[in-house]
A protein has these predicted regions:
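P-loop NTPase motor domains
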Residues: 98-390, 394
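Basic- and hydrophobic-enriched, low-structure N-terminal and domain-boundary segments
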Residues: 1-110, 114-117, 152-162, 349
């Protein structure tokens, strides 16, 4: 071996390439074996994670979160003092796109509002639907939103007037106050009906967000029967009523006039007469077809249906609530068109009127989704965010 190392130049000088088939076959086999050995070693290297056998979790750093943040700090959802999540649904690199659903869990006084909701509201980068259990958020953030963020041009530069002052873009502020109705704007669910499909959606919204009374309240038959009657009456109001009659108050009035007599199956109440007249004019009217299905019930059954309807809608008979729902000022369908802040003020100790807010939220989400899909091709011009306060079951 020592001789070979000392005289390597002489040995290599004498080597000549051989084209003998045995020599060539030996070389090919040797090359294949060498390649297999290299491949096996690389393969094993992929399976082994030396030094992290017990896990590789670690705390993230600024470089880890950076791809998920917008370069414009005002277009982020603040999570901590140094971490945030971009509001952009389509970032430059799609692999960093994330949904914007965030859950914050904490007890009373833990800072959910102070350290998450308020900083997010102060970004003023979208429309907001804010559940305000104590009515304090609108007092603390209202003036700021009324002034609005600085207006920017197409290039992202802050706009100024001729005198050099910054031009602001004020928010449209809406309030539904179920603690003090005298400080609330009006909300009329009928204002957002455009077709028969919307009537069915409204009926579902009413059923889901209110509750009946008694043993029959949760039985499928009675709920479906109630839906038939609500659908017929709401369709009649929307198609045949005057503009000032298109509200829940008229629905309650029609229910009050829908008397039935068990001993007299031929008795006609004022509502029966109205539908009979409508049927004579238009036998295929949507309201008529729904009402005829409801009228298949016998006198005793029809009376039970009316009692269920009356129990479900009883809270709407309160004078203050009737006034609130007489016409609409909310303009829910425009929240995705312009920067709007909708404050839903509710009591955190009394849930009596929470169903009103639940109805509004159900209708709002349906409206915005439909408008995004049908009008804007899937994306609203202004991003809309909901800050909802929920109590976890114990």
């Amino acid at each position: 071996l020592l001789y070979a190392m000392e005289h390597a130049d002489r040995i290599l000088t004498g080597l000549q390439p051989s084209f003998n088939w045995r020599d060539m076959l030996t070389g090919i086999v040797a090359a294949v074996i060498l390649k297999l050995l290299v491949w096996q070693k690389q393969s094993d290297a992929k399976k082994l994670r030396k030094g992290i056998e017990y896990g590789s979790a670690r705390w993230g750093n600024a470089e880890d979160i950076k791809p998920y943040m917008s370069e414009d700090p005002w277009m982020n959802i603040p999570l901590t003092a140094t971490e945030a999540l971009t509001m952009e649904s389509r970032p430059k690199q799609p692999k960093y796109a994330r949904n914007k659903n965030i859950v914050v869990i904490g007890g009373s006084g833990s800072g959910k509002t102070r350290f998450f909701v308020k900083p997010s509201v102060m970004q003023m980068n979208c429309s907001m639907v804010i559940t305000d259990p104590k009515g304090t958020l609108i007092e603390e953030c209202g003036k700021m939103l009324a002034k609005g963020p600085p207006k920017k041009d197409k290039n992202g530069n802050i706009m100024k007037d001729k005198s050099g002052k910054v031009v602001h873009e004020p928010y449209v502020i809406k309030v539904l106050n179920t603690i003090n109705f005298s400080k609330s704007l009006h909300y009329n669910p009928f204002a957002y009906i455009r077709s028969e499909k919307d009537i069915l959606k409204l009926v579902t919204t009413i059923i889901v967000n209110t509750k009946g009374e008694g043993e029959k309240a949760s039985e499928d038959f009675w709920v479906k029967a109630e839906k038939l009657l609500y659908t017929a009456l709401i369709a009649f109001i929307w198609y045949e009523g005057d503009e000032e009659e298109k509200n829940l108050n008229t629905l309650l009035d029609l229910l009050n006039e829908s008397e039935t007599r068990e001993e007299d199956e031929t008795y006609q109440n004022p509502v029966d007469m109205m539908f009979q007249e409508l049927e004579e004019r238009d036998p295929q009217h949507f309201a008529v077809r729904q009402y005829k299905k409801y009228k298949m019930a016998a006198g005793k059954t029809a009376k039970s249906i009316l009692i269920s309807c009356g129990a479900r809608l009883a809270p709407f008979d309160i004078a203050e609530l009737r006034e609130i729902m007489s016409y609409d000022e909310m303009e829910l369908d425009k929240i995705g068109d312009r920067k709007t802040a909708l404050f839903l003020i509710m009591s955190d100790t009394d849930t009596t009127f929470n169903f009103v807010i639940a109805m509004l939220q159900s209708q709002l989400f349906n409206l915005l989704c439909d408008k995004a899909d049908d009008v804007y091709g899937g994306r609203l011009p202004v991003h809309a965010v909901s800050y909802t306060h929920l109590t976890l079951p114990t």
